[in-house]
Swiss-Prot record:
Assigned protein family: Belongs to the TRAFAC class translation factor GTPase superfamily. Classic translation factor GTPase family. EF-G/EF-2 subfamily.
Known function: Catalyzes the GTP-dependent ribosomal translocation step during translation elongation. During this step, the ribosome changes from the pre-translocational (PRE) to the post-translocational (POST) state as the newly formed A-site-bound peptidyl-tRNA and P-site-bound deacylated tRNA move to the P and E sites, respectively. Catalyzes the coordinated movement of the two tRNA molecules, the mRNA and conformational changes in the ribosome.
Name of the protein described by the UniProt record: Elongation factor 2
Main localization (coarse): cytoplasm
Length: 732
């Protein structure tokens, strides 16, 4: 039996004892050392050779990950660790740090209860650190902190132990500020990290050593000793005395919750069903004898096994042959069941509540599906990802014979990675794939060509724009084709606070609201008039429709059709058929024919649509473009070249700081200016640059560029070059 199988054997003896299980994630800014830490933890648990740890990158098992040196998927490893005479099962998920793959982080956070936040001691807390901490805390996932790359402070920055400790204090304070800002109210104090209580560890994942207050008490090795070990090139000796995996996993077991403890407070946040039902009680108590309730957090497409659904089991026991219901997609049968170690699936007979399982047989499942032994179980809350696709490519099969297979592959890819949006046009054969950035789409194309062996042709990258309005417009009369029905809509920009509440999930999507009272209170707290809030009809993207009419006969019967009209407009705006962002539409009046035959879909939908389009024309339509916040570190002598590169791309420098010979720049650059930036900034600075970015929402396209951008989008979509004006919609 191999070491992995042996470990899984041990794991199977532990799984039913939930107090001995920990489901944890590792999150960080890109290149702060997550995957190296993961590998050394796995090596320490005897799952791979210690000599290879940190070099093999067992969780970066994808060929693209190893070639690019970054983590693209969220990989899973189950391992066993002995602590104070007991053996614990630790299910570990390594997540991407690159902003293009942030959707994977969001999904991983649903599966875990605790998280190790890794921060590079030289760079400190970075933008993506804040994003991943916010994602974890939003899912009620408890953090501990590992400050990595301490050897760089000693060897490169030549800091003594006092100077190092000042830097640590700043990093810990920055992390605690984020915890205060984003943690659930009941945990803002309790979840603060501190050195004294052992919730912070320091070390070098690459050199396989760590230190914490509990370890100092045990080994008597202090920060001053660490400086001497590193200066004198004795990190191997240090790694034998202060083993990284022991110190980090001991911290995990001491401070991160077991599934039963975590589910007692997490379930109410991630599932809005009745907690007094059998499945509700079973999930809160993590009962392996209860009904099966699992949330799929990842789909892997395997060339041999097909679709593998990986997810967190919150209740019940899954066995081979179990019939399960999949939310929105009928039934599936468990054909094979496994636990995961990177790319390896180790087959098991059963998986119990509180653990992470890999199942073959749930064909209709996607990331986010609820899987249960109960038909029509209330689904888990949708997972909220903080960014949306900003770049699109048109893709078509080089050989017509490959077209049907390409369509299947694109569907598989959007199942496996829901942050890739696929728009399939079977009539033209041209399909659109939209992703979080250039790298995201590069990796997706690589997989289509190499994993699925389909030759494709693609367009140049296309930026995903949004439309909005600048002021109030309307009421605007929209008439039905038979002229028997008239609707009057007003539109105006939605308050930023309301948009934020929608993006945070406090105001849910759709028109069927379970808890309308709470949503109304949220709207009022964000500055919406109470009477107007009571008229809430529909939320589509970041846009809201309200009905503020009083006592109009037959209106209730046509409301579903008006929702359809509103949804259509919000997905295809009047300027360039792009999605609409941050618009409030108010129905203020309507005149309806008394005979229902004259107010069917073919009459009501065009009338509602034209009313909203016309009001938007009167409200001054504007185009928004996605922007990215770019963080650049360069030596002082290369600063001018870096600034020049940013400004050539319509970028603006927002902040500049200097530490020693290093200059840090913060810039905002439109996504349309970011294509090819990676190679350009490297060549401009002679390769002496470290840079990263995060998506930073949308900004107005400069007025002098708007007409030409709108025209080019419309021509690409086969529309007439000029958008229609209000008179056109009035005459319809």
């Amino acid at each position: 039996m191999g070491r992995k199988e042996d470990n899984i054997e041990k794991a199977l003896r532990i799984v039913e004892h939930t107090e001995l299980v920990r489901n944890i994630g590792i999150v960080a800014h890109i290149d702060h050392g997550k995957t190296t830490l993961s590998d050394n933890l796995i090596a320490g648990a005897g799952m791979m050779s210690e000599e290879l740890a940190g070099k093999q990158l067992v969780l970066d098992y994808d060929e693209q990950e190893q070639a690019r040196g970054i983590t693209i998927n969220a990989a899973v490893a189950s391992m066993v660790h002995a602590f104070q005479g007991k053996e614990y099962l630790i299910n570990l998920i390594d997540t991407p740090g690159h902003v293009d793959f942030g959707g994977d982080v969001t999904r991983a956070m649903r599966a875990v209860d605790g998280v190790i936040v890794v921060v590079d001691s030289v760079e400190g807390v970075m933008p993506q650190t804040e994003t991943v901490i916010r994602q974890a805390l939003r899912e009620y996932v408890k953090p501990v902190l590992f400050i990595n790359k301490i050897d760089r402070l000693i060897n490169e920055l030549r800091l003594n132990s006092d100077e190092m400790q000042k830097r640590f204090t700043k990093i810990i304070s920055d992390v605690n500020k984020l915890i205060s800002k984003y943690a659930p109210k009941e945990f803002t104090k309790e979840w603060q990290v501190s050195v004294q209580d052992g919730k912070v560890a320091f070390g070098s994942a690459y050199n396989n050593w760590a230190i914490s207050v509990p370890s100092m008490a045990e080994t008597k090795i202090t920060f001053k000793d660490i400086v001497e070990y590193v200066k004198n090139g004795k990190q191997k000796e240090l790694a034998q005395k202060n083993q990284l995996h022991k110190i980090i996993l001991n911290m995990v077991i001491r401070h991160l919750p077991d599934p039963k403890t975590a589910q007692s407070y997490r379930i109410k946040q991630i599932w809005k069903g009745d907690l007094e039902t059998e499945v509700g009680k079973s999930m809160v108590s993590c009962d392996f004898k209860g009904p099966v309730a699992m949330m799929v957090t990842k789909i892997i497409i395997d060339p041999h096994a097909g679709e593998i659904a990986i997810g967190r089991l919150f209740s019940g026991t899954v066995k081979k042959g179990t019939d399960l219901y999949i939310s929105g997609d009928g039934k599936g049968k468990v054909q094979t069941l496994a636990m995961m170690v990177g790319p390896d699936r180790i087959p098991v007979e059963e998986v119990t509540a509180g653990n992470i399982a890999a199942i073959v047989g749930l064909k209709g499942a996607i990331a986010g599906s609820t899987v249960s032994s109960i038909e029509n179980m209330e689904p888990f809350e949708p997972m909220i990802h903080y960014s949306e696709p900003v770049v699109t490519l048109a893709i078509e099969a080089k050989h017509t014979a490959d077209l049907p297979r390409l369509i299947d592959v694109l569907r598989d890819i959007s199942k496996a990675d829901p942050s890739i949006q696929v728009d399939i046009n079977q009539e033209t054969g041209e399909h659109l794939i939209s992703g979080m950035g250039e790298l995201h789409l590069d990796v997706t194309l690589y997989r289509i060509k190499n994993d699925y062996k389909i030759e494709v042709e693609t367009s140049e990258p296309i930026v995903v724009y949004r439309e909005t309005v600048e002021k109030k417009g309307g009421p605007f009369e929209g008439k039905s084709p038979n002229k028997h029905n008239r609707f009057y809509f007003e539109v105006e920009p939605l308050k930023p606070e309301v948009i934020q509440a929608i993006e945070d999930g406090d105001i849910p999507q759709g028109s069927k609201f379970k808890d309308k009272k709470t949503i109304i209170e949220t709207l009022v707290s964000k500055g919406i008039d109470r009477e107007e809030a009571r008229g809430l009809v529909c939320v589509e993207g970041t846009n809201i429709m309200f009905d503020v009419t009083r006592g109009i006969q037959y209106l209730d019967e046509t409301m579903e059709l008006l929702i359809e009209a509103f949804t259509e407009v919000m997905n295809r705006g009047p300027l360039a058929n792009e999605k609409v962002f941050g618009v409030k539409a108010r129905l203020v009046d309507a005149k309806l024919h008394e005979d229902s035959i004259h107010r069917g879909p073919a009459q009501v939908i065009p009338a509602g649509r034209n009313s909203i389009y016309g009001a938007m024309c009167e409200a001054k339509r504007i185009l928004l473009e996605p922007v990215q916040k770019v963080f650049i570190n360069v030596p002082q002598e290369e600063m001018g070249s870096a600034i020049n590169e940013v400004q050539q791309r319509r970028g603006v420098i927002e902040d500049m700081t200097q530490e020693g010979e290093e200059v840090s720049l913060v810039a905002r650059i439109p996504v349309s200016g970011m294509f090819g930036f990676a190679s350009a900034i490297r060549s401009a600075t002679g390769g002496k640059v470290l840079w990263s970015f995060e998506n930073a929402g949308y900004q107005k396209v400069p007025p002098e560029l708007q007409d030409s951008v709108v025209r080019s989008i419309r021509e690409r979509k086969g529309l007439r070059p000029e958008p229609y004006d209000a008179d056109y919609y009035a005459s319809m």
